[in-house]
């Protein structure tokens, strides 16, 4: 496979209609998706939902105005506890899920049944410079796509159509939206959104942007921009784990190491393991926190 083919397998493509105030984004992730699903043995229903949320995160990150990270989460109280996907302005992504691994999950189990009651959708913006912003709303809708449409109607008050799909081979998404502060004939918007709704889940997962946009809009073709390529990359590091341990405090961390000999932290996304033994922990806190936990006199370490 040549580099162009690889790139187009993991790309977000912007488009806009010159004759009406409507913009759109198409995303298809293939190699990135393969890398993510290899990290865990996801049940089929959860794998599908995670792929849809991943595609949604890449779509929504297309509207990032500043450098940073967009995080989308779905949290529930059923068999599925959490789905999370992250997309950065550097065009890297990662995603994972947490669920009750003792529960039986049917391949066709619905998102609502997986999440149980009182689910929430969380969208977080973490700019490289500045304070993070977070929005939390109750889950509304029977699918991730419908949930996002409801969220965007509430937050942006813009007519939006979102379609999401995930298969074993790829995750895909399509977003079509009115431009803000522009007048659009209702019949024109209805025409565009109706065409967008004819796209099947199979087509969305299988076809690249060129074929999707021709399939939908060949009679009134939009202006299409150069694809933006994405790759899978985890942002975990030993330094970030150290910061987390410092936040927990020397008493708690020292107690764990005194009892177990070390403390191990696994990354939920890429499964990297970070192990801190007695020497590591004492150096991190600048004192013999493990010794204190064992009942020895407190003293600093170099």
UniProtKB/Swiss-Prot annotation:
Keyword annotations: Chaperone, Cytoplasm, Disulfide bond, Redox-active center, Zinc
Pfam families in the cross-refs: HSP33
Compartment annotation: Cytoplasm
Any one GO BP annotation for this protein: protein refolding
Domain of life: Bacteria
Disulfide bonds: 234-236, 267-270
Any GO MF annotation of the entry: unfolded protein binding
Record PTM text: Under oxidizing conditions two disulfide bonds are formed involving the reactive cysteines. Under reducing conditions zinc is bound to the reactive cysteines and the protein is inactive.
InterPro entries cross-referenced by the UniProt entry: Heat_shock_Hsp33 (IPR000397), Heat_shock_Hsp33_C (IPR016154), Heat_shock_Hsp33_N (IPR016153), Hsp33_helix_hairpin_bin_dom_sf (IPR023212)
Annotated Gene Ontology cellular component terms: cytoplasm
Principal location class: cytoplasm
Family: Belongs to the HSP33 family.
Primary role: Redox regulated molecular chaperone. Protects both thermally unfolding and oxidatively damaged proteins from irreversible aggregation. Plays an important role in the bacterial defense system toward oxidative stress.
Cross-referenced NCBIfam families: PRK00114.1 (NF001033)
HAMAP family: HslO
Stated name of the protein: 33 kDa chaperonin
Name of the coding gene: hslO
């Amino acid at each position: 496979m040549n580099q162009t083919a690889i790139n187009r397998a993991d790309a977000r493509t912007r488009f806009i209609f010159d004759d009406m105030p409507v913009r759109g984004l198409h995303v298809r992730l293939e190699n990135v998706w393969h890398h993510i699903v290899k990290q865990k043995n996801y049940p089929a229903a959860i794998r599908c939902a995670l792929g849809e949320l991943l595609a949604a995160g890449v779509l929504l990150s297309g509207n990032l105005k500043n450098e940073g990270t967009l995080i989308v989460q779905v949290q529930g109280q059923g068999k599925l506890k959490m789905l999370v996907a992250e997309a950065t302005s550097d065009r890297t992504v990662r995603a994972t899920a947490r669920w009750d691994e003792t529960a039986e999950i049917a391949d066709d189990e619905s998102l609502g049944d997986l999440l149980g009651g009182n689910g929430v959708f969380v969208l977080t913006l973490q700019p490289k410079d500045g304070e993070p912003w977070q929005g939390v709303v109750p889950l509304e809708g029977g699918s991730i796509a419908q949930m996002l449409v409801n969220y965007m109607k509430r937050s942006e008050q813009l007519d939006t159509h979102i379609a999401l799909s995930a298969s074993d081979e790829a995750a895909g998404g399509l977003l079509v939206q009115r431009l803000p502060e522009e007048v659009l004939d209702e019949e024109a918007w209805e025409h565009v959104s109706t065409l967008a709704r004819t796209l099947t889940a199979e087509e969305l997962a299988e076809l690249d942007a060129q074929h999707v946009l021709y399939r939908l809009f060949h009679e009134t073709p939009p202006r299409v921009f150069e694809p933006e390529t994405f790759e899978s990359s985890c942002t975990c590091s030993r330094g970030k784990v150290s910061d987390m341990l410092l936040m927990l405090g020397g008493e708690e961390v020292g107690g764990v190491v005194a009892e177990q000999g070390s403390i191990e932290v696994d990354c939920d996304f890429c499964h990297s393991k970070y192990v801190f033994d007695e020497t590591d922990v004492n150096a991190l806190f600048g004192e013999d926190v493990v010794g204190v936990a064992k009942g020895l006199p407190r003293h600093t370490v170099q």
